[in-house]
Each structure stands twice: as structure tokens, then as C-alpha cells.
Amino acid sequence: MTITVLGIDLGKNSCSVVGLDETGRVVLRRRVTRDGVVRLGAKLPACVMAMEACCGAHHLGRVLREQGHEVRLM
């Protein structure tokens, strides 16, 4: 399972994450807390992490960027 893009839907209490491989196929679908997103990012090799631009997204983006990921806010 090689995840190249991780889509993150930020919520107040939980976040939904979807991981896509290089062909665009869904290989991971999970609901986690915001801290869980950071822990998941630490386990994954460097990839693109896409999330909506909302309050808290910039902080989470900085944390994920420090882990070596490419963060894209939409």
C-alpha cells in the first residue's frame, strides 16, 4: 500500500482521511482525531496532503510539512 495523496476533511471533533495510490485508487479510508492525523502522517512516507483551508488547517499543515509532506490547502 503506497499512498501518494492523502485527502483530509477537517472536522470539529474528527477528521476523515482518504489515501490514494499512484493510480488514483482508494487504498485507505479512515476517521481519526486531529492528533490522529499527525500520528498517521508520521507513519507515512512523504506524500501530498490535501485539505480544506479553514481555521486550524494552517497549524496542521505546518506540522505535516515538518514531517516532510507536501501540504496543499484548497
Regions found by a protein language model. Name each.
Residues 1-74:
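Phosphate- and other anionic-substrate recognition elements at nucleic-acid/protein interfaces
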